[in-house]
């Protein structure tokens, strides 16, 4: 018998040391990753984010089933990811299978693992990757030091020269809640909006995972707590639990997608069936 393929999906058994993930200091993909964040941190202003909400949140661009949207990610390699250089569709199934092993009783959680990055389809419909992928962070207030490449990529951002949004709270009230905070625009917020628009029935915990899984300064570094309300604090453990599968299931051992599809199609049919508006 050959090696157990499930090892590729089990965070606790993964052959890659956890300290090797999210290496933003060197590596074969460093230049690509840095350049993506440089563009993001230069152009993602408060006004830019408001504009993208107007463009994408009405979900009037195209119609596509969830599985077809996942398949479309075969064409996308995330240029902000220092860990992988293969299509995003494989990462979807890796994440879902990792969750399935650890949480076999939570089918909605498994589905979130599968679909969490599907908002990246924006990159296949005219958006540059710096407006789609990568870590997210609030705009309209001080950029915290935990943001990736904080000290080397924001010098060209006009908001950095505006005193109003450069305080700890900026345009927000203390403990206003993340629902009232404008995040840098990307696939997290877009997919959240698609889920709400199409009345998908994924539980609130899953919607939080979708909306904030890329908000590393919050869920992994503990920043921006001054903007969080009680609900955000209650949901944080769920986002943290999701993160370990999102991050540590990445592997060059790619899953047998065709074998897995029927099971995950049944979850799609349960929580976000049919053709969706994007």
From Swiss-Prot:
Cofactor needs: Fe cation
Primary localisation category: cytoplasm
Residues annotated as binding Fe cation 2: 117, 187, 213
Localization in the cell: Cytoplasm
Swiss-Prot/TrEMBL keywords: Cytoplasm, Iron, Metal-binding, Oxidoreductase
Superkingdom: Eukaryota
Binding of Fe cation 1, residues: 91, 116-117, 246
EC class of the enzyme, as a word: oxidoreductase
Enzyme Commission number(s): 1.13.99.1
GO terms for cellular component: cytoplasm
Membership in a protein family: Belongs to the myo-inositol oxygenase family.
Name of the protein described by the UniProt record: Inositol oxygenase
Organism of this sequence: Danio rerio
């Amino acid at each position: 018998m050959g090696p157990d393929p499930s090892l590729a999906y089990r965070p606790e058994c993964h052959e890659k040391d956890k300290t090797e993930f999210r290496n933003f200091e060197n590596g074969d993909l460093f230049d690509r990753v840095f350049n993506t964040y440089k563009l993001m941190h230069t152009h993602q202003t408060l006004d830019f984010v408001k504009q993208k909400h107007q463009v994408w949140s009405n979900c009037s661009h195209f119609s596509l089933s969830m599985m077809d949207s996942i398949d479309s990610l075969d064409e996308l390699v995330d240029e902000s990811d220092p860990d992988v250089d293969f299509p995003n569709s494989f990462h979807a199934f890796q994440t879902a299978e990792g969750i399935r092993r650890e949480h076999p009783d939570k089918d909605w959680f498994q589905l979130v693992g599968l679909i969490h990055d599907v908002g990246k389809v924006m990159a296949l419909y005219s958006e540059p990757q710096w407006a789609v992928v990568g870590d997210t962070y609030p705009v309209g207030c001080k950029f915290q030091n935990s943001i990736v490449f904080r000290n080397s990529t924001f010098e060209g951002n006009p908001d950095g020269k505006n005193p109003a949004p450069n305080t700890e709270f900026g345009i927000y009230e203390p403990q206003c809640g993340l629902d009232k905070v404008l995040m840098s625009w990307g696939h997290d917020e877009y997919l959240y909006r698609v889920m709400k628009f199409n009345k998908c029935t994924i539980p609130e915990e899953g919607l939080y995972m979708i909306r904030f899984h890329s908000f590393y300064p919050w869920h992994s570094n503990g920043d921006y707590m001054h903007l969080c309300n009680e609900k955000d604090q209650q949901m944080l453990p769920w986002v943290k639990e999701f993160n370990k599968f999102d991050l540590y299931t990445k592997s060059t051992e790619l899953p047998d997608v065709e074998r897995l599809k029927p099971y995950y199609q049944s979850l799609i049919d349960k929580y976000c069936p049919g053709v969706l508006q994007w």
